[in-house]
Amino acid sequence: MEKLFIFKIGGKMLDHAEELEAFLKGFSSIQGRKILVHGGGIFADDLAKKLDIPITMHEGRRITSAPMRDLVTMVYGGLLNKQVVARLQALGCDAIGLSGADGAVLKAKRRKPEPIDYGLVGDIFEVRRDLLETFINHGMTPVLAPLSWEASGEILNSNADGVACKITEAFSGLYETYLFYCFDKPGVLLDVENPASLLAQLDRPAYESLKKQQLVKDGMLPKLDSCFRARTLGAHKVLLSTPTNSLKFAAGADYVGTLIH
């Protein structure tokens, strides 16, 4: 079965031009089929502060008001997405930038307001694999912003980790899917200040235990929830690590990071 590499990168990397450039060079050199999903929460927060738009989070998930939804649409679907696509094109990677509204590629329903009202947040229930597959078959690399589309015509904010998970799920019956969550740590750490506390592997019971001890919390919760969901739904490999280590693993090296079981 042919391999498909799905990378998710976050706002911290997007906020550091040199790190982003190094990653995009490595990503563009990957042979074969690949998809890139990006976040951008740091950019969104910075702009929200300048515009006096309140920022509200719950357990690492953004509560999205109408003004915040408009802001993330501009930031994620506009500036950040097109900057990444422009750099990939310059590096010889034929990329196409998409939000979930483009071709209704990420179909979602607004999350129910109980027990927490997350506002204009979409839970993705369908990925248009046929559309993404068309681009991939033409040698193009889809670059997706974490915005989804509701049938009413509403644009909804969706968690980028969840977007990567749903895309992996959609393709897992067609390809041997490799999902990489790239961030600024080498993986899941028992002590965030000590890289030597890296967990090389993590299964569901161990994760639940870490949650109870509050050794993982905040933004790591939705990330790890997405990791286990992707693994359950057919992902061949799911790795949390740095961009450099993730790229090396995609190129055939032994993994360094946290492999999800």
Describe each region flagged by the PLM.
Residues 1-261:
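C-terminal catalytic "cap/lid" subdomain
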